């Protein structure tokens, strides 16, 4: 099977206690994992803590684990102590309450970078749609980010996208001193 890398890879030192990566934007539905210097038990999610009951990746080869990939373009942001992000009319926000999300401008420099700094691995706490008379047909999510202090208005002209955020947690019951887990989002294609 052929692989194409997506985004930057992550390496985590394996120890006898659970170690969790920084959050990353989910840009692919496959996560390739290689363990060196000791078998690794792996947990993936919004706030994972690996245990020896989780999925095992041995030093004998790599494993490809599935993730849920979700994203949506953002056309509006309502600032406040919590922040409301709107999808284009006629579309939905695929995120659920409890998910974690990250805003990315994907090269767009029209918006204040404070939005991406504050809306980074932030928990979704609400979801709404106000369709109907007096409504706007935009589905919205509310996140825990406090953007009340951002002085610049959000500009929808550009590629502002909200991505699902995940973390990876690993643990090894008997790692060597140089034990490391390498993690990379990949796209897979047919047979190699």
Regions found by a protein language model. Give the residues of each.
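C-terminal interaction-tip segments
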Residues: 1-14, 172-192
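Surface-exposed ligand/attachment interfaces on beta-rich extracellular proteins
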Residues: 4-27, 49-51, 82-91, 111-115
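Beta-sandwich interaction modules
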Residues: 22-23, 60-70, 165
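Short, surface-exposed beta-edge/turn micro-motifs
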Residues: 27-30, 39, 122, 166-167
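Short proline/glycine-enriched turn/loop motifs at strand-loop junctions of beta-rich domains
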Residues: 28, 34-41, 90-96, 176
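Short, surface-exposed beta-strand/strand-loop-strand elements in extracellular ectodomains
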Residues: 37-53
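Terminal beta-strand-rich extracellular "head" domains
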Residues: 48-64
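Small/polar beta-strand repeat architecture
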Residues: 71-181, 190-192
